Amino acid sequence: MTLKKLNLHLVSDSSGETVISVAKSALKHFRSVETIEYVWSFVKGEEQIDKILEEINRKSDEHNFVICTITDDELRKYLKDNCIKLKIPYRAILSHIIREISSYLEIEKDEKLDLHTEINNEYFQRIEAINYTINHDDGQNIQDIDKADIILVGVSRTSKSPTSTYLAYRGYKVANIPFVSGVPFYVDLAKLKNKLTIGVTIDVSRLIEIRKNRLTSINNEDNNIYANPEKVEKEIKEAEELFKQNNWPIIDVTQKSIEEVSATIIQYFNKMLSID
């Protein structure tokens, strides 16, 4: 398979995270394309755009493509007009969506929003959420569990940790707590206000399979308790009884992706906020 080379110029007036994410999603559809990404972040003026265009011009004999998420209309038009002059393919991502929403609702977009401050705040909030979630994995640091947005409870190997991490990247502070059969549940979650607690469960046979694979991966196949069918079934049953006693929403993660599980959790979270 012959690879086609593409210089992808990603231009943003902020960190560039959005345009990078969109570009990566699009490029997944082209296995025959070898891409070199040039990320131009925090572009605020025409002089910066001129420098970008100079750099692209140096590679005029190659394939170049510009994608931008510049929100300022005049600056975006300046980039677009110059790309047209230089015959460089150009696509703005956000402007079309903003225009369609504006047209559909028959309202003008807000011109004087401090978008950079908002984006920076979102970034730091996400970092804070990630740090919190990492430090509250598997029942750690429960002394400040009241600072969590979401709490996941479930038996071992029910995807609590990866789900927590995924949610953290979405900006949610997540704590996850293991349920262990025969051990009294040691956290009083009933007294917490405005916190979503989710009970995570899974099909018995699927959990046995996952646990056996885990034991094999760590060369501990002699462990006849961790994946014992009777023990696993008892463990799940006790966990589900705890969930029901506390009226926690229960999510069955059997054959579900982390993204699917997380989307369901976010729906529960938004519903909780709307009720409050």
Swiss-Prot record:
For the keyword Transferase, the answer is yes
Q: Name one GO molecular function term.
A: phosphotransferase activity, phosphate group as acceptor
Q: What is its EC number?
A: 2.7.11.32, 2.7.4.27
Q: What class of enzyme is it?
A: transferase
PANTHER family in alphabetical order: PYRUVATE, PHOSPHATE DIKINASE REGULATORY PROTEIN 1, CHLOROPLASTIC (PTHR31756:SF3)
Family assignment from sequence similarity: Belongs to the pyruvate, phosphate/water dikinase regulatory protein family. PDRP subfamily.
According to its UniProt entry, the function of this protein is described as: Bifunctional serine/threonine kinase and phosphorylase involved in the regulation of the pyruvate, phosphate dikinase (PPDK) by catalyzing its phosphorylation/dephosphorylation.
**Name of protein:** Putative pyruvate, phosphate dikinase regulatory protein
User: What is the organism field in this record?
Assistant: Wolbachia sp. subsp. Drosophila simulans (strain wRi)
Phylogenetic lineage: Bacteria, Pseudomonadati, Pseudomonadota, Alphaproteobacteria, Rickettsiales
